[in-house]
């Protein structure tokens, strides 16, 4: 057994309904390399529970009232103060109600019986959202939503990040870390702490924690990893101030993913070098390109608070592959090497995890599971009779046949997230999507006919896309509404490290601007040769959303956990909520909330 004591950390803000894959996966890889003294902490979930505690919400009300009083004493308010006053006033009105009911709301979100009743679920969801809005008012203009976090400081700018790390009035995680995390860490002599940054909005919370740990325990080696770290690694390495509180970065092979592909090996190699007496270097790459996932044991979720996630059932993330088997879309940077796990190993892992953690529910976190892998895994799952239920993400391609969809359903697939992007033939070809409107329609129908809930993602405002072409996508979705459970749509922006960014003229992009003041931005500012203007795109998106809201059932539209289609609640609803979706027995009952007199 190796002697290094290690802590793996997932910082705010992410999905509070399930664990994130990278930590359990890294823990398992480290154990296989002899590092057994490894703890893992989900500070993302902990931060939600800290601020949504009844006692903390009572303090929020005190802070809100005090701030309102201070603003009231001013002779006049400027525009920013007026906006803050409005948010504080709303929070002061809602907080007594929210404080009384937050415990019941969290209980509903963890209860499979209550959560399956739409009215009670939506009532609990409303309390949760309003509680976060009230906390946001306390830290105005910071906005904390489920799975989203925004400050007046941009995570795309190193200078603004540094300012955010000490902004007491803006950064809620300073209090959370000082009150709930640092005292806990002080009692355990960790040698190395690895902070996994998966999403852009985690950069400020992650580095806030790193800086506080550096000040409190300067002898701890602080490592930064995860997908976002890997994506930005060259730019982060050019940021000298980062080295004052981060000792090393261990990055993935060029395969962006929820788990890690090579980053876990690189971290193990760093630990081995440190035990051999070498000083940790600032940047560590995988020593070799990852050609197989055979080196990865099943993820180890031990030590995570699996009963505290805000989900009616425990949904565990798992990956059958890394990367995208297509890897040619011009708008996407997921073009690295694609590697798969052997289907027999997948089934063996799922059987182990299901038995060990007493759950039937799994979220396949692959970027997109290939039709061939779906066929192999479905066949073996059915043969093994594991009786598990799962969600996956797929490309709408010809390989998703009616036969394959039936096989997937028989093996427990209950929900699929489908990246439609556009339903216009020219735009699909321009994007190198590798599909057609006819194939899109057939895939959706095949999945629906097999009993698999279909969730669609699309984009508006692709380079040179006209309003008529964007309308083709909307008309397509409305025509296929019987096969679609819900739709998510966002405005398209060109991202760095994509073919569109490298060869803009090919896609009708006239100018492209990589703002030097935003080196950590994913997106680029562009102007196109034709298509809709930004104002026209925003106007069409509003029209798109109104049309979809009218077309899809209210329960289908709203019952995905705060609009995040990958969540545990989506899979649960697909498995169990159908019998309740038209029930009127609970109408008006809601959460049995205690209303203000």
Spans of model-derived segments:
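Flexible loop/turn segments at secondary-structure boundaries
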Residues: 14-17, 47-48, 200-204, 230-232, ...
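Short acidic/polar active-site loop segments enriched in Thr and Asp
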Residues: 36, 191, 359-360, 414, ...
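Acidic, low-complexity intrinsically disordered segments
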Residues: 2-347, 355-356
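Radical SAM [4Fe-4S] cluster-binding motif and immediate context
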Residues: 291-453, 475
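A structural motif corresponding to the C-terminal lobe/cap of the Radical SAM core domain
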Residues: 2, 7-14, 21-22, 42-45, ...
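C-terminal non-catalytic accessory extensions
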Residues: 566-597
